[in-house]
Regions:
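Catalytic cores of nucleotide-sugar-dependent glycosyltransferases that transfer UDP/GDP/TDP-activated
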Residues: 1-176
Length: 176
């Protein structure tokens, strides 16, 4: 809780609107400055105003693909809204694996000159959590069907987002 730390985020007067599953979703940019470092957050209470982050004691949220797709694509939208061209985008685990997948393959992102010089670093903290969904997740995020192969995102009949985050940049798979 930022308030307990005495940090008051400022809401930047930018509302982001972009498509998930072919429907518009909205988010607000919140920014904090702490010891000279600015951190931007994406706010959407429908996706993240919940008691639990990933799941309840009964299991995963049914919309986790959309929630973390919103986070991944929203990070790119924040960069564009603030005209911040990142040199490096550091993604962590399956929850942000859609970001490198979408930069490489999503129709309106793959040719976007805004990110042409950006590079992605992908860190895996816990390989047990892989973000596996039905193959229709490709359509939800405007990704081509040809990605659903054993050399791509397919893993035992499901789309595996963690695998996709690794496979997009083959050099990651070669690291020791």
């Amino acid at each position: 809780n930022l308030a307990r730390l005495g940090i008051k985020p400022r809401t930047i007067s930018k509302e982001l609107v972009f498509c998930l599953d072919w429907l518009p979703v909205r988010g607000r940019i919140k920014e904090i400055e702490f010891n000279g470092v600015y951190v931007d957050f994406l706010k959407n209470d429908e996706f993240f105003g919940r008691k639990y982050i990933y799941s309840t004691p009964q299991g995963d949220f049914a919309d986790n693909d959309l929630r973390f797709g919103f986070l991944s694509l929203g990070a790119l939208e924040i960069a564009k809204a603030l005209d911040f061209k990142p040199d490096i985008i550091h993604c962590h685990d399956w929850q942000t694996a859609l970001l490198p997948i979408c930069i490489k393959w999503r129709k309106h992102l793959k040719d976007d000159p805004f990110f042409k010089d950006s590079r992605v670093v992908f860190t895996i903290h816990n390989i047990s959590y892989q973000g596996q969904y039905d193959r229709n997740v490709l359509d939800k995020f405007g990704l081509p069907e040809f990605l659903f192969t054993s050399q791509g995102l397919e893993f035992y009949g499901k789309a595996n987002l963690l695998k996709g985050g690794i496979f997009v940049y083959p050099a990651t798979a070669k690291e020791p």
